[in-house]
Amino acid sequence: MGKCMIIGCGGVASVAIHKCCQNSEVFEGIMIASRTKSKCDTLRDKLQPTTKTVIETAQVNADNVDELIALINSYKPDVVLNLALPYQDLTIMDACLATKTHYVDTANYEPLDTAKFEYKWQWAYREKFEQAGITALLGSGFEPGVTGVFSAYAMKHEFDEINYIDILDCNGGDHGYPFATNFNPEINIREVSAKGSYIEDGKWVETEPMEIKRVYNFKGVGEKDMYLLHHEELESLALNIKGIKRIRFFMTFGQSYLTHLKCLENVGMTSIEPIMYEGKEIVPLQFLKAVLPDPASLGPRTVGKTNIGCIFRGKKDGKDKTYYLYNICDHQECYKEVGSQAISYTTGVPAMIGAMMIMTGTWKKAGVYNIEEFDPDPFMNALNKWGLPWEEDFNPVLVE
């Protein structure tokens, strides 16, 4: 079918690469490109004997547009799958524009020096991508990603209008460390230490970090504390789903995680402001990332399950209706299949599926689009096929 360039070689990228190699009818060739080529080579050497997909590797600095353009022109992929850092989204989009190559990512752009993420920077590329005749698919992970597909599916098949969405992200896994993050520590800690927010009646309502707490009983996991966070898909879903009055995002955290995080905040280790140390400028949060366990190393020691989904409330044929779409994923099953814990798995699988939707022409329109702006049905079918089966509940317990 075609070739895909995957930029990044962390935990999520590793899962996406494994899944591309399982899907060699679509992904005839992939190039793994990262700042550290040796990591790419190690993964290629492990996977090449197991797949018909031809794997190539390259070194690239994703902050350098000229380097990216040269590499894309050399390999000539049909689509670029950006699994690098959110700070690098715009340089990679610039390179895709210059080479007229389709673009897919899993997280929206975030300036390196400001812990604030929103879509305005990427949405500003809409006209340029339209004129170039190429597609940019934004947010093809789980959240954002599957949550948007779930929302589009609910809108298409279950509702005339959706008034309330609660996105619930529960990780019931235990890795045995006193403190570690399940994905990039720098991104994770920036996200959870920022102020929370939700959208109500078309306006953002801001909260203090971890101010709003709820308790929910998750199927396959049990009762967990969850906290309201700001999350990027709220912004696009509020625009793209008909009838929205309120949309919120909750994530579960254990008390040990929160206690450690508070201590680190109190001593300044979560700061993104540079400081001078022995004549060198360092960012405390980046230093903390260097001493914490690598999320990619958590797979063999993480047990338990995740449960991530969306509770919808709205109207169908003039009557009130509730509907819950969710996925349950087992950390150890993920590790057996691709050597990863479920957090990376639940992001890496949809990343591959999004690239497949663009590569096969199943989703085809020039411009910059969020995932809920496409037909959800082929993506929903692919989730069941490629390892993230979804479940439905037509009488869910609601979040107050």
Segments the model singles out, each with a brief description of its role:
Residues 49-64:
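Rossmann-fold cofactor-recognition segment
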Residues 106-134:
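Rossmann-fold NAD(P)-binding glycine/threonine-rich loop
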Residues 13-17:
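N-terminal Rossmann-fold NAD(P) dinucleotide-binding loop
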Residues 156-400:
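C-terminal catalytic/substrate-binding lobe primarily of soluble NAD(P)-dependent oxidoreductases
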Residues 4-11:
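Conserved N-terminal Rossmann-fold NAD(P)-binding element of oxidoreductases
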Residues 61-77, 84, 88:
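Conserved Rossmann-fold cofactor-binding substructure of NAD(P)-dependent oxidoreductases
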Residues 35-39:
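Helix N-cap at the beta1-alpha1 junction of Rossmann-like dinucleotide-binding domains, i.e.
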